[in-house]
Amino acid sequence: MLAKAFAGSKSHKILINAWFTTLPGQCQKPIVQFVLSPILVSTNLTPSILSLPVQEKSSSSFVMAYRLVVAPEQIIEATVTLTTAQLHYLQRVLRLQKGDGFMVLDGGGGVWRAQLNDLAHGTAQLLETVSEQNELPLPVTLAIALPKGSGFEEIIRPCTELGATAFQPLLTERTLLKPSQNKLERWQRIVTEAAEQSERQWLPPVAAPLTFGQFVEKVAGPETLALLCVTRLNSPMLGAYLKQSNLPAQIVLATGPEGGWTDNEISLAIAKGFQPVSLGKRILRAVTAPTVALAQINALLES
């Protein structure tokens, strides 16, 4: 299904086209195949939800509210049907009781203040729409060469907190990890937890892995600034390059595996329009580089 949605402030809105698939046995975790053209958001919400009163987010009313991401299909009119796991989390972990409030997010920009109202049937009532904007002003997709072990988990949690729009795992010539379907599902759960904690409106999808060759073929386009983090090359610093460039509709940034990109991979990426950039004179670990790069982009976009 082709999904479109809006992101950005009232003065700057962009769109992202994304193809979503569903993991086997799961219907509530959208997985993006790849984010290409920028521009995000129209949700298929019912009129009764859209007509809920809108309240601007205030620190006094919402700063301590617990947040829960639900699938859009769990919301019918103004009622949220919770899964068994979600109800257990609210009741047993957070110790919420009937009548207690929390925040509901649909992962696609919708945020509501809700009240737990029927424990027997596991439902909550949406009370009002919350207007807030915590997303980056333009989409940033991180394409990450899969590190060994649990390294990818170390990357996606802080990068979700920093505002990454989507994650594209890469299989490179030096990649050792070949993830299973269970790994993909676990990664999406970690992203969901981080999105709830960091008060994101959008749930960054974790795509199915692509080979490096498949990836560079998909990225090309005049609306995309494609960046390749490299070492030991005479490349401009990431921050300096971004300051000198006209900001595009979206940014796609790729970071390499342990041992770095091969010469063939660097040449292929440059031939496909990627700009090599440096993160500094020091050699960063594969699990460190994505967070450092996104933090630099974040600081520039939000300054």
Swiss-Prot record:
UniProt keyword list? Cytoplasm, Methyltransferase, rRNA processing, S-adenosyl-L-methionine, Transferase
* EC number per UniProt: 2.1.1.193
Please give the catalytic activity noted in the UniProt record.
uridine(1498) in 16S rRNA + S-adenosyl-L-methionine = N(3)-methyluridine(1498) in 16S rRNA + S-adenosyl-L-homocysteine + H(+)
Compartments where found: Cytoplasm
Instruction: Read off the InterPro entries from this record.
Output: Alpha/beta_knot_MTases, Diacylglycerol_kinase_cat_dom, PUA-like_sf, RsmE, RsmE_MTase_dom, RsmE_PUA-like, tRNA_m1G_MTases_N
Q: Predominant location of this chain?
A: cytoplasm
Domain of life, source organism: Bacteria
Report the GO molecular function annotations: kinase activity; rRNA (uridine-N3-)-methyltransferase activity
Q: Which GO terms describe its cellular component?
A: cytoplasm
- Which SUPFAM superfamilies does its entry note? alpha/beta knot, PUA domain-like
Which GO biological process categories is it annotated with?
Answer: rRNA base methylation
Q: What Pfam families does the record tag this protein with?
A: Methyltrans_RNA, PUA_4
Q: Does the keyword rRNA processing apply?
A: yes
Q: What does this protein do?
A: Specifically methylates the N3 position of the uracil ring of uridine 1498 (m3U1498) in 16S rRNA. Acts on the fully assembled 30S ribosomal subunit.
Entries under NCBIfam families matching the protein: PRK11713.4-1 (NF008697), RsmE family RNA methyltransferase (TIGR00046)
* PANTHER family listed in its UniProt record: 16S RRNA (URACIL(1498)-N(3))-METHYLTRANSFERASE, RIBOSOMAL RNA SMALL SUBUNIT METHYLTRANSFERASE E
Name the family. Answer: Belongs to the RNA methyltransferase RsmE family.
Q: What name does UniProt use for this protein?
A: Ribosomal RNA small subunit methyltransferase E
| Species this chain originates from | Synechocystis sp. (strain ATCC 27184 / PCC 6803 / Kazusa)
